[in-house]
């Protein structure tokens, strides 16, 4: 009985963080982050001050991530095109070649978005969560305004509403 109690306690201790509520970083100032883009450019998030920034963390093997990325151009990119908005889909934990291959497949299907690389998962560590899919919305003041992990069909609609609100708050 004691052994069962110890095993149950260990299970709860190890598994509970997986189900912890996301959004814990909401309100936090974004640390200095430089994203290496798939095309070789570097984007410093601090240079995006004044813009609303959406970071979408994903992996080539993650089916929920790919579902979300397939919806991204229509629900997010086209809606905010030409406004003070920046979106980067950050592939984490994978080599450039694998990411480039998957992005080429997606582009053949008409799914086009800016792609950043985080092969050593340093960016997601800086933002405090390594799970995927993950969306982080950074306000014009470079503070995290939305942080959500996991995929639901409604999630991009919710994110779009937050982005719209942040864009409308700007002078």
Whereabouts are the PLM-identified features?
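Bacterial N-terminal signal peptides
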Residues: 7-17
